[in-house]
From Swiss-Prot:
EC annotation from Swiss-Prot or TrEMBL: 2.3.2.27
Native organism taxonomy: Eukaryota, Viridiplantae, Streptophyta, Embryophyta, Tracheophyta
Keywords: Cytoplasm, Metal-binding, Stress response, Transferase, Ubl conjugation, Ubl conjugation pathway, Zinc, Zinc-finger
Organism: Arabidopsis thaliana (Mouse-ear cress)
Compartment(s) of residence: Cytoplasm
Protein name (record): E3 ubiquitin-protein ligase MPSR1
Length: 204
């Protein structure tokens, strides 16, 4: 049975993630950073309690692991500074360019997929980008679906013209999809002001 603290963490995860993530680019520049909790307390006048409840939530979107850290007074300004100083990144790669990547077989078992950090298996089939860097098919397809460049060398994949326009018009929208072990899935968060936790749903 989940403890009161675990339930509280789950609630904070769903409520702050939509407000913290601002766009697809930030999600990729900081792939393990999902969000941090607001400095709120139940009575509104106890600053010590509010500070003690501040948490930073780290998520690996590929392994679906989550770590909750207690925040510090210096972390909040640092993270907000990263948000404000970010530069626009490249839009998602076109579906045609992703589908066109060849499937190759790994000769040996040395090395790893730099996205999920899993080691290659002997005779495993992977996808190879035009820059010759190789990744698990599922990993690189997810990556390029958010950001159209190689995660190793930043080789730029072709993008759709309408995706560029859509990105400029929908700069405040972020789509996130991952699941926790309890069967709940957080997805399709909108970073518009006034967003709520409607993106949390139960899986059957």
């Amino acid at each position: 049975m989940a403890t009161e603290q675990e339930a509280e963490v789950g609630t904070e995860t769903s409520s702050v993630s939509g407000r913290f993530l601002r766009n697809r680019d930030l999600y990729l520049f900081l792939p393990f950073l999902l969000g941090f909790s607001d400095q709120e307390s139940s009575n509104g006048d106890d600053d010590d309690v509010a500070s003690s409840r501040e948490r930073i939530i780290l998520v690996n979107p590929f392994t679906q692991g989550m770590i909750v850290l207690e925040g510090s007074s210096g972390m909040n300004p640092l993270l907000r500074s990263l948000l404000e100083s970010r530069e626009e990144g490249r839009p998602p790669a076109s579906k045609a360019s992703i589908d066109a990547m060849p499937i190759v077989e790994i000769d040996g078992c040395e090395g790893e997929c730099v996205i999920c950090l899993e080691e290659w298996k002997s005779e495993e089939t992977v996808k190879e980008m035009p820059c010759k860097h190789r990744f698990h098919g599922g990993c690189i397809e997810k990556w390029l679906g958010f950001h159209g460049s190689c995660p190793v060398c930043r080789y730029e994949m072709p993008v759709d013209g309408d995706e560029i326009g859509k990105k400029r018009n929908d700069g405040n929208e972020i789509w996130v999809r991952f699941s926790f072990n309890d069967g709940r899935r957080i997805r399709d968060f909108s970073a518009q002001d006034g967003g709520n936790s409607d993106g949390v749903e139960s899986e059957n």
